[in-house]
Amino acid sequence: MSIENFPSLNSEEFTEACHHLDRQYCQAPLGSERARWKLRLCNALCTDFSYGGGFTTYVQIRRPLEFDLDHGDLSLDLDGFSFSDEKGPHVSIAEDKDMLDAEEADEAALIRQRARPEIAMVEYEIHLHPTYRVPCLWFTLRNLPADEPAFDVDTVFRRLVPDEYKAGLRTLGNVGGISADHHPITGVPSFFVHPCLLGDAISKFECDRTNYLMIWLGLVGGCVGLWVPKEMAMQ
């Protein structure tokens, strides 16, 4: 489980580290948090030959930017619901009507569900950087309002970066801070946290393939609003 040239990783070591992070996620007792903080292990053909080409393993994490506790419009669906046991003389007719009303309500609920706008979210991805040979955190904002550009650094600072990180990231600029480039899988312009300063920070920790990405996320993720559930850290 050791890392040959720590903190640098080769492709095999990074792939194994991704599998360990995925297992921690699958085994953690996340409860309801699992519905909004989603992690999955991915394999894809890398289109950027600077990343080595061929198939690559990476980790994708998604979370909502705004979480509505009434997601699903339950308050609207339950407006006409009653627990009353009172029954009139025309019970069968009333029940038939109730059944028809329920079917119509179900259809209306489905229409509302289809029409409901998609939730704004952030999608993070962990890839092995081809030059620095350490994990690199990419991220993309999705389903933002039409008047809010997703590929805009001001939007990133407003939506993702906690106040305590803003001054430091702006001082670092494009080297050591938030940078933009073509995504290694899709080729679409995307943001990433520049990995050049990671080596000094993570070298202070005792890492192997089983815990490397958990420690790395603790060092890197917070500056763009990515926090690992504590249940995963306890695995």
UniProtKB/Swiss-Prot annotation:
What top-level branch of life does the organism fall under?
A: Eukaryota
Q: Which GO terms describe its biological process?
A: autophagosome assembly; autophagy of mitochondrion; protein modification by small protein conjugation; protein transport
Active-site residue numbers: 196 (glycyl thioester intermediate)
Q: Does the keyword Electron transport apply?
A: no
Mind telling me which Gene3D superfamilies this protein's record contains? 3.30.1460.50
EC annotation from Swiss-Prot or TrEMBL: 2.3.2.-
Q: What does this protein do?
A: E2-like enzyme required for the cytoplasm to vacuole transport (Cvt), autophagy and nucleophagy. Acts as an E2-like enzyme that catalyzes the conjugation of ATG12 to ATG5. ATG12 conjugation to ATG5 is required for proper localization of ATG8 to the preautophagosomal structure (PAS). Likely serves as an ATG5-recognition molecule. Autophagy is required for proper vegetative growth, asexual/sexual reproduction, and full virulence. Autophagy is particularly involved in the biosynthesis of deoxynivalenol (DON), an important virulence determinant.
Quaternary data? Forms homooligomers. Interacts with ATG7 and ATG12.
Spell out the protein name for this chain.
Ubiquitin-like-conjugating enzyme ATG10
